[in-house]
Amino acid sequence: MDGFAGGLGVRPVAAEDGHARLEFEAREEHLNPAGTLHGGVLATLVDTAMGLAARSTAEDGVPATSQLTVTYLRPGRPGMITATAEVRKQGEHLLVCDAEVEQEGRSLVYALATFAVVRH
């Protein structure tokens, strides 16, 4: 994976038919002063997973995040993190996706996003 998410170490596992899955190894440098996984890292994971899911369905155009709601359920710790995403509704100009981040089988984050399909 290239760009910002790739620089963090995010690894795409699958992205097809409106579904995506990512893996991420959280390390000490990803923690906040409280010693838990920084919320910005978790937001990046859900946005990236939903973007991959959205792109897997967009035949013509590029989905761009227009709204993102992130609900933090519990803190993350160093270790393997998994993010999964799914396109829930697809229209001509907008897509709605949701995503979940898990660690050791426990939900850390639930997110919902709207993507605008940008055509060039």
Predicted regions and their residues:
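Non-catalytic linker/capping segments at the edges of enzyme domains
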Residues: 1-23, 28
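HotDog/MaoC-like acyl-thioester-processing domains
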Residues: 59, 74-78, 82-120
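A short, polar/proline- and glycine-enriched secondary-structure boundary/capping micro-motif
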Residues: 32-35, 120
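Short secondary-structure boundary/capping segments
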Residues: 12-13, 62, 87
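A short interface-forming secondary-structure element
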Residues: 26-32, 42
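Active-site helix/loop of acyl-thioester processing domains in fatty-acid/polyketide metabolism
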Residues: 37-62
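Short connector loops at helix/strand junctions that flank enzyme active sites
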Residues: 5-7, 17, 45-49, 63-67, ...
